[in-house]
Amino acid sequence: GPWEGGMVTPELKRLFEERNVEVISVEDGTRVFVEEVTSAGQENPIVLIGNSMVVPGEPEKGMRKWKISRRVNLEESPVFQDHKIGKNPVLPAVHAMAWMVDVCEQELPGFMLSSCENFKVLNGVKFDESLAAEYVLELQEIERLNGNFTDVEVKVSSLSGSESGSKKLPRFHYSTKVRMVQQVPEAPLHDRIDMSNSHNLPGSTFYQDGTLFHGPKFQGIEQVLNIGEQGLTLECSLPEISVAEQGQFAARNFNPFAADLAFQAMLIWAWRFHQSGSLPLKTDLLEHFRNVEPATRFFLSMSVNKSSASTLNANLFLHDEQGLLYTRMWGAEVTLSKSLNTLFGKKNNTAGKSKIKN
């Protein structure tokens, strides 16, 4: 360790003290040095004086990079027949996120989802003639800390181009940064919940009139408790869905059917205040604390950040009656368009608004 005096100036001594590095006094250092080098029976003495200078939490080396291919088809995941836009089944954005998370969990045994950051829908996957023969997940570890957590950048792509062309180009569909941890933090409380039942609208109304295009397996909204310009509160419960129906996208530690209700909530709000349909674009951050089990009664609170005729950005919180969180989403954003109303099968472009009274 550093000795006081000599090259350790008063300024350098203060710097060591700020960093909790012990400076050895001349008297103590001289005494220990003399005792050690003059003691019998030590051919090669090694003397350590002072506190440990090991810096905790140093990033580990050897970041992994790998690719995984998957063929996707509707026959193996028939649940998406209940997620049609127009006539075509579409992979829900949150199921794409769950797909990337699931691959990380399989490749990193012992780790669990903590968060997804900067999730983007670049080109959604449709189960029609545009469905690629194969999809590639590219994973790149970008940070790892002493086995406590690892951050993985994930991208989903496919090859596009003419069959006769000499080279096909990658087409990117989704991207995010997944944080995997060995110990998920305790679920915090969402302390700004509004459980007032001022509107009391059955969720079935929105599924039946085409505000929401989702079929029975995705119909988890039981009631709209309240709705206003600043947000809304929903009462929810997920239907039972077999593993066989979910197929290649079977939910494990992160239930995408629960998270999908967040985007359904945004759709209800978009119709109420803009008379438009909406589709997911991105989420700044999703934090996951515990899973929502089927038939569990839970609530979804939405707080609007900003909205316009073309976009809606909001924070969404899935929680129990006391406010204890399951999942929260910061900066979720959807694109708005009145042309989506027809695709969603909206039956009456004024009825939905009139049913929600201020």
Show where each model-derived region lies.
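Flexible glycine/proline-rich, aromatic-decorated loop/lid segments
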Residues: 1-13
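Conserved thiamine diphosphate
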Residues: 10-27
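Acyl-thioester-processing domains in fatty-acid/polyketide/NRPS systems
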Residues: 23-358
